[in-house]
From Swiss-Prot:
HAMAP family: ATP_synth_epsil_bac
Listed Pfam families: ATP-synt_DE, ATP-synt_DE_N
Coiled coil: none
Family: Belongs to the ATPase epsilon chain family.
Subunit structure of this chain's protein: F-type ATPases have 2 components, CF(1) - the catalytic core - and CF(0) - the membrane proton channel. CF(1) has five subunits: alpha(3), beta(3), gamma(1), delta(1), epsilon(1). CF(0) has three main subunits: a, b and c.
Record protein name field: ATP synthase epsilon chain
One GO CC term, this protein: plasma membrane
Length: 131
């Protein structure tokens, strides 16, 4: 079966590099499924899991925004942050989720609501991928 070369890179360096049969990402415009031979595309990404399929198995990588560049035989994801399920510290992600929920419940003038909502989305994404 044909494959795509997939690279997921953050400012801290590479996170993932493999040949994959299919990649699914959540772009700002909606879900994007990428197979070998896909037309060239560039799209901004939402906070979500990237699904990588190979040999009937699916791997997940938690991505916190960024962009995806698609070429017929190569996909590059430039992410603000990215972690494979093995790299995620579940306790730390759970603590981040609790902190964000507390901030949102307080709703005091010094709490940045948008920032707290983004922190909650990132924590939930990390916990979903870690499972």
């Amino acid at each position: 079966m044909k494959t795509l070369k997939v690279n997921i890179v953050t400012p801290d360096g590479p996170v993932y590099d493999a040949d994959i049969e299919m990649v699914s990402v959540r772009a700002e415009s909606g879900e994007l499924g990428i197979l070998p031979g896909h037309i060239p595309t560039v799209a901004p990404l939402k906070i979500a899991a990237v699904r990588l399929k190979k040999d009937g198995q699916t791997e997940l990588v938690a991505v916190s925004g960024g962009i995806v560049e698609v070429r017929p035989d190569h996909v590059t994801i430039l992410a603000q942050t990215a972690e494979t399920s093995e790299q995620i510290d579940k306790e730390r992600a759970l603590a981040a989720k609790r902190r964000a929920e507390e901030r949102l419940q307080k709703q005091t003038p010094d709490v940045d609501i948008i920032r707290a909502e983004l922190a909650l989305k990132r924590a939930i994404n990390r916990l979903d991928v870690a499972r």
